[in-house]
Regions:
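Non-catalytic nucleic-acid-binding/docking modules located in mid-to-C-terminal regions
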Residues: 54-58, 102, 125-128, 146-149, ...
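Noncatalytic, basic helical substrate-engagement surface that gates or grips nucleic-acid strands
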Residues: 1-131, 138-160, 237-239, 245-253, ...
């Protein structure tokens, strides 16, 4: 079995930036260029490569607004603007990955999640490959399958989420994560869900009905105020499910052979680290 690692690049850079930004330790080199996100990013990439030893790697990035914003202008509207000191570090991250022999990829009108979803789908369809997704974003848990698992990053470690661990945690199949979001919403992405339905109620409903489609087909068997909330929020539930669903057909025009790990360009890498003043 050939192993592919699918890394959420935006997630890693944001995590690395805010890990020190909150404490006021932005880290800058002598030219006053911010380096804190890059420092954590490099350490994380090296850790992933050492632990996983993959043959195939892609680091996916967002590329501006995507098709979800066209359908729902308020998508992720509650998030603060990306700090300029973080934005400056993205191009250097791409250069570092290139020097490491790792493919970085962003596609117009799609999110990093969609790129990862596309490669996850490719792993599902090809018996020669399995894939591990690396991110702290629970949205990606919907991609878990027999051939795909998720290293769900925590503050100091991670949880390896596979089909069994997901079921033990939620009592559902991983794909039902989109139905869970359809009902309870997601404040971080500004996905509305059904007003008044929280995680506990949503899980109980899905344990009984499995999908929102089956739930609404059997809405008369739901009792009390929950039924009223569901009826009132039906349109929002279906819309939320659509927005929460990761798209798996991004036109990447690539196969796994195109993300095969290449030899590191040690000279280029050394020069980048020297410029950033990474000496350890």
């Amino acid at each position: 079995m050939k192993r592919a690692i699918l890394i959420d690049g935006n997630n890693l850079l944001f995590r690395s930036y805010y890990a020190t930004a909150y404490s006021g330790n932005l880290m800058k080199n002598s030219k006053d260029f911010p380096t804190n996100a890059l420092f954590g990013f490099v350490n994380m990439i090296n850790k992933i490569m050492n632990e996983e030893k993959p043959e195939y790697v892609v680091v996916a990035f967002d590329k501006g607004k995507n098709f979800r914003h066209e359908e729902y202008a308020e998508y992720k509207a509650g998030r603060i603007e990306t700090p300029k000191d973080l934005l400056k570090q993205f191009p250097i991250a791409y250069d570092i990955l290139d020097a490491m022999g790792i493919v970085s990829l962003g596609v117009d009108n799609y999110e990093a999640d969609d790129i990862i979803g596309t490669f996850a789908r490719m792993a599902d369809e090809d018996d020669m490959y399995d894939a591990t997704i690396v991110s702290s974003d629970k949205d990606l848990l919907q991609l878990i399958s027999h051939d795909v698992n998720v290293k769900l990053l925590k503050q100091k470690d991670y949880i390896l989420m596979n089909e069994q661990v997901f079921f033990d945690t939620y009592g559902l199949k991983p794909i039902r994560m989109i139905d869970l979001k359809a009902l309870m919403g997601d404040a971080s992405d500004n996905i509305p869900g059904v007003k008044g339905i929280g995680e506990k109620t949503a899980l109980n409903l899905l344990h009984e009905y499995d999908t929102i489609e089956n739930l609404y087909d059997n809405i008369d068997s739901v009792k009390g105020k929950t039924k009223d909330k569901l009826i009132e929020g039906k349109e929002s539930a279906y819309f939320s499910k659509k927005i929460a669903t990761i798209y798996k057909e991004v036109p990447v025009n690539m196969s796994f052979n195109d993300i095969k790990l290449k030899d590191r360009n040690l000279t280029k890498l050394k020069n980048i680290y020297k410029d950033l003043e990474f000496f350890s």
